[in-house]
Amino acid sequence: MTGLPILEISGLRKAYGAVCAVDNVSLHVGRGEICGLIGPNGSGKSTFFDCATGLTRPNAGTVKLDGQDITGWSLNRIAREGRMLRSFQKTVVFSALDVEENLVIAGQMFTFPGLWSTFGIGAAARDRVAALKERARELIKIAGLWEVRHQPAGKLSGGQQKLIQFASMLMPEPKLILLDEPMAGINPKLIERVVESIRLANEKFGVSFLVIEHNIDVVTDICARIVVLDQGRKLAEGTPDEIVHNQAVREAYLGG
């Protein structure tokens, strides 16, 4: 990690009435870092993501992306810029389109101002489509979906659809991706594929990641640093080894 963090969040607070879901949490993600965010159910992880990505406005605190204060920006505004993207626990794909078409559409949504500017008539439009297809094919290989690239997304497994979603988020060349439980509901073999895809994207493109994940083996495997939340507050922060052997974390999250 060098220079300013790609994401720097300070004193974040979000309350719903008398319930404080996130209480004065500060966190940073370094450039090129894979950082984990864990905690028991109800610890504030998803609310923290929502505040960081503009889905929910925090009551207090600041969010800086690449050194720019984006506190209070809407989810759409942040997404349109393409520098920081997030996944949701519910996977969404274009079921009738094949894998490659899903990625091309995703790339168009971020890269060009209107659908018909990409899929129009003329040499410029053809060049844009060709560039998107080239990028899509590179990412399909990274996601391990090459053999099924021409199959409708709706015919593939839930794990494969998560890989489509992951590859789609890489289309606009983001600097940071926030993943919300990317391993949930997929079989062990595909978990290995998702882990490898995250690693490849990080190594090849320098994408930084902040990952919410309940699979502790995955988090300790791919993350250089882990932040633990409990009851809306930061409980601990450290290397995977430090977190696994932290007694307070074991009591709150790992079952003692």
What positions do the PLM features span?
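Helix-to-loop junction immediately C-terminal to a conserved catalytic motif
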Residues: 53
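The feature captures the beta-strand-to-loop junction immediately N-terminal to the Walker
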Residues: 38-40
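Catalytic Walker B motif of ABC-type/P-loop ATPase nucleotide-binding domains
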Residues: 177-181
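Conserved ABC ATPase "signature" region
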Residues: 116-148, 189, 196-199
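ABC ATPase NBD coupling module
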Residues: 57, 69-85, 89-91, 125-133, ...
